[in-house]
Structures are given as structure tokens and as C-alpha cells.
Amino acid sequence: DGIHGIWFDYNKAYEILKHFAGIITPDFSLFSDFPLPLKWWNIYRMRAFGFWCTTLGINVINNVRWNNDTLDICYQGIPKNGIVAIGAVASRLKYLKNRGDFEQYFINMIEELQPHTIIIYGSTNYACFKNLWTSGIKIVSFPSRRNKKKADAGDAQ
């Protein structure tokens, strides 16, 4: 069922999730070619799933996903001065043409939410992440499968 299984079969999801100390909310896509209501729906689903887990006593770290169309709502429901997670893989940062917008939105997210810790899935080998090391924001990174394969091959990014 993939990521949608947790939304449509939430009781089964709970039976699995209750065994963990906490979760990162799901990363429902906000592709640029999605209609705006679908982007809003996916942001809603991320926050609603996190809220539901919180009501069940599960610790929640909010995943943050944004694009130009959703900056007015993408941070709603996420506590300030906390821990957030982002995915660098789906952001397509490896392509130079995507980095400018990503960095702008990333800075906007930091200003808006003022997180003390950011969990990053994917490579942190980009200027916007390296600048955070001196800002006092803790960065916790988890390499993607691709990054792990490259590291194993001796060609880490």
C-alpha cells in the first residue's frame, strides 16, 4: 500500500507505529504539476496524521514539504522552536536549477519555525545545509539509499 496505506488503513498503521518511540510524519508529495487543492490536501494529511499520532501518545516530528504555491499554509500546525524533518532527495537538489528555490524556501522555513534541530534525509553536501553548522541549529542527517551506495563505492557525495 505504500505511504497511502497509513492514511487509509490507520488502525493497521497504529499497530505498527505504537512499538516505536516516535515518528516523522509522512511526506505526501507536492509536485509542481499537482493542482493546488491536491497540494493543500497533502499538507493537511501530513499534519492530520501527526496530530492523530500525538493524541495516541506517539511522539511526532513534523516533516516539512513546501513549494511556491504552498508557502502560506505549509508551516501551519508545526510547533515553533522544535524539531523538523525535511527530505533532500525528493527536493531534487542534485539539479542546479532547483537549488535556488529550495534554498530560499529553506531559509523561509527556518525564519518561520525557528527549529533547534533539523533532520535531513539525503545528502547534506549543499551550501544551505553547511551554513547551518555555525548558526546553532543542530543538523541530523540520514543518507539516502543512493548516498549509501555511492559511499560504499567510494564516491560519496
Predicted regions and their residues:
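Aromatic- and Gly/Pro-rich donor/ligand-binding loops
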Residues: 1
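Eukaryote-skewed repeat-based solenoidal scaffolds used as protein-protein interaction platforms
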Residues: 4-151
